[in-house]
Amino acid sequence: WLPVVAEQVINGNGNYRERLQHAAATYTAQLLQDDSSALWLIDKQPHNFMHVDLILALFPNARFLYCRRHARDNALSLWMQSFQAGAQDFAYDFTDISAVIQGSRRLVNHWLTRYPDAIRIVQYEHLVSDPVCLLRGVADWLGLPSHDLVSNTPDKDSIISTASLWQARQPIHTRSLRRWEHYSAYVPELLQLPDH
């Protein structure tokens, strides 16, 4: 959606502020289709980090959680996933995966220097190992109450509009930590990525 919204801002009618307001309204309407009474909207598209300037222009109070994962585990997870054609074409070549991971980390670090109050980096390994502790800090940062942050039972009735529906319904686990180590003898390309 963000490329479409960006196009509206660049080529739309009216002055810049009006185009931003129209684009923000269009984007919000799209997100509210599934739950029109939602108080908070979460857009977990993996490439949103490339559009931080645009998102903050549209929604000045937006907050970004960037989940950083061990590069080799991240690469293996991408490489083993079957994506729609054109969606994540870099995910089938470890040189490309490495470039994307390292490039995204550099860009997020840039955004962090520009918008330190709007961005929080969380480590995947900490999230799955101690979700309550990590999420208490996130809730505090967002100004939300921290009670009932993690349920032992995934909410079967909550609306999830994403391809990872099945995964989102599973309990948090640590089975994927350092998973790359089990594959490195068979997929030595993993070793070209940093060990962090």
What are these regions (language model features)?
Residues 1, 69-74, 127-128:
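Conserved nucleotide-binding/hydrolysis micro-motifs of P-loop NTPases
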Residues 38-53:
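Conserved adenosine/adenylate-binding substructure
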Residues 7-39, 78-121, 129-196:
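PAPS-dependent sulfotransferases, especially Golgi type II membrane carbohydrate sulfotransferases
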Residues 52-55, 126:
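Short gly/Ser/Thr-rich phosphate-binding loop of adenylate-forming enzymes
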Residues 41-43, 63-68, 121-124:
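Structured core elements
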Residues 55-79:
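Conserved phosphate-donor/acceptor-positioning beta-strand/loop module used by diverse small-molecule
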Residues 1-2, 12:
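Active-site cores of enzymes that catalyze phosphoryl transfer or operate on phosphate-rich substrates
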Residues 46, 126-130:
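Acidic, metal-coordinating catalytic cores used for nucleic-acid/nucleotide bond scission
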